[in-house]
């Protein structure tokens, strides 16, 4: 048998789904149980999961923030595949504003890192939201997907969802809950396909970054 390994480095930027996974306050906790067991005579092991559509790393569907928006089964896929720019926003305070981004170059997809270390074991509400004006500016630059290692592009207590609404206005897409701890600022290939869920307001992703072909 031949052994194949990609010559380009891969970063897994997904959260691990597990009991105890931090969740949005009041949302459905992640649960997993084995329903068929080989140690009980079944020829196979089979499990059952319960979770929110916004558990872990996920892509919001427009249905999440617009009553007539596309569901997760209807979203096009090209936004979630291709070259992206990872931006280190750890020095920013308050919210990610246009003034914080003078170094952003042209890119179809922009991912923001704000945590020094991703909070795998606790829910933190002190993340950096993305200003609606920043979304508007990114859209003018041709950006079609915004990603963040935060649980949301808006503040936890937001009632206006202004960043989400700006994304909707420009038919952009959102990835939330990324894990970017080990990823240096720069350009990568993104692959992060949300699950195809009818009536889904979001789809869980196994998101990865890969070195661009000419890197190194």
From Swiss-Prot:
Q: Where does Zn(2+) 1 bind?
A: 54, 58, 60, 176
What is the active site of this protein?
64 (proton donor/acceptor)
* Pfam families given in the database record: Cyclase (PF04199)
EC number of the protein: 3.5.1.9
Query: Annotated pathway, please?
Result: Amino-acid degradation; L-tryptophan degradation via kynurenine pathway; L-kynurenine from L-tryptophan: step 2/2
Instruction: Name the chemical reaction catalysed here.
Output: N-formyl-L-kynurenine + H2O = L-kynurenine + formate + H(+)
Q: Which GO terms describe its molecular function?
A: arylformamidase activity; formamidase activity; zinc ion binding
| Annotated binding of Zn(2+) 2, by residue | 60, 164, 176
The answer to whether keyword Metal-binding applies is yes
Which leading EC class covers this enzyme? hydrolase
Per the annotation, how and in what number is the cofactor bound? Binds 2 zinc ions per subunit.
Q: Does the keyword Ribonucleoprotein apply?
A: no
Please list the residues that bind substrate. Answer: 24
Q: Name one GO biological process term.
A: anthranilate metabolic process
- Cofactor(s) needed: Zn(2+)
Q: Which UniProt keywords apply?
A: Hydrolase, Metal-binding, Tryptophan catabolism, Zinc
> What's this protein's function?
Catalyzes the hydrolysis of N-formyl-L-kynurenine to L-kynurenine, the second step in the kynurenine pathway of tryptophan degradation.
Q: Show the NCBIfam families listed in the entry.
A: trp_arylform (TIGR03035)
Subunit text: Homodimer.
What family does the Swiss-Prot or TrEMBL record give for this protein?
Answer: Belongs to the Cyclase 1 superfamily. KynB family.
Q: Under which name does UniProt file this protein?
A: Kynurenine formamidase
Where is the organism placed in the taxonomic lineage, from the top?
Answer: Bacteria, Pseudomonadati, Pseudomonadota, Alphaproteobacteria, Sphingomonadales
